């Protein structure tokens, strides 16, 4: 039951009065189409918020700020108990545009790199990225200015639902792609037992995630034999290269900054990876969390 509760959380509401402090934030301004109110859309993956008691400076609450979420306050703002600070889509991971411009798709070919399905709730047709037999095609969305210059590029991961059409004009902060989240993991103890055994025997999971070993900036290399090369470069110039199968969902984009231990692809993180990167305490926390899930 715990996993399904986590999956449907969609906001952070303050339980305290205090001052909001935010670290590592990259965000773009956006306007709510319905209410006309301004908010920020978070485009960094390492942002973290704290609510601090203004008098004692004691930290009352800390929370990661999910990528793609809406942020309704700024760093240093006074927060009242009951204020909704952040909201996100509980059912979909998203890719949002960091810039305004026109969208151009690359390698988006029907029945080769995507299929069309009707959404059950809206009845609208959607383009869903599929595993391509043609390994040279890597679907991507480019945001271009009026002269056709590339402003920003986004890889389209497997299973992504593309919510824009070629040539659409997009504003900074708009959602380009939705990726349905897996709601609930093991479901109950019987479904989760194989995973528990896997954990305690420290076996590597059947579908391991690719994890960055260093803090650094993400870049993409070439496609090699059905794998996408991901290159992480640290501030000191250390470079780590990882190969991710094209059948896996890549969770990062070009120029993202990641910390050691950040998964670059979907799948279960192996206890061995966590031990090597973050040490024994982190492994204990991870095993407890995984068993509870």
Placement of each model-derived feature along the sequence:
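Intrinsically disordered, low-complexity regulatory segments
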Residues: 1-293
């Amino acid at each position: 039951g715990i996993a399904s509760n986590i999956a449907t959380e969609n906001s952070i509401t303050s339980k305290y009065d205090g001052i909001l402090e935010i670290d590592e934030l990259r965000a773009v301004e956006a306007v709510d189409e319905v209410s006309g109110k301004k908010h920020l859309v978070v485009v960094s993956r390492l942002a973290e918020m704290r609510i601090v008691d203004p008098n004692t400076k004691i930290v009352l609450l800390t929370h990661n700020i999910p990528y793609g979420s809406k942020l309704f306050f700024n760093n240093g703002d006074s927060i009242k108990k009951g204020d909704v600070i952040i909201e996100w889509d509980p059912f979909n991971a998203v890719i949002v545009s960091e810039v305004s411009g026109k969208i151009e798709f690359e390698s988006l070919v029907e029945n080769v790199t995507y299929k069309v399905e009707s959404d059950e709730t809206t009845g609208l047709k959607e383009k869903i990225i599929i595993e391509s037999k043609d390994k040279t095609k890597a679907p991507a969305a480019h945001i271009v200015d009026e002269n056709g210059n590339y402003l920003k590029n986004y890889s389209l991961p497997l299973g992504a639902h593309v919510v824009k059409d070629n040539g659409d004009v997009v504003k900074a902060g708009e959602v380009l792609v939705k990726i349905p989240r897996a709601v609930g993991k093991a479901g109950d103890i019987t479904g989760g037992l194989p995973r528990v055994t896997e954990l305690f025997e420290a076996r590597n999971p059947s579908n391991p995630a690719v994890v960055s070993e260093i803090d650094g900036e993400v870049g993409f290399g070439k496609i090699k034999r059905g794998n996408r090369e991901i290159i992480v470069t640290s501030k000191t110039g250390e470079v780590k290269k990882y190969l991710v199968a094209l059948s896996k969902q890549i969770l990062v984009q070009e120029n993202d900054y990641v910390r050691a231990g950040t998964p670059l692809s979907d799948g279960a993180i192996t206890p061995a990876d966590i031990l090597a990167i973050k040490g024994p305490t982190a492994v204990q926390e991870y095993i407890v969390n995984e068993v509870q899930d």
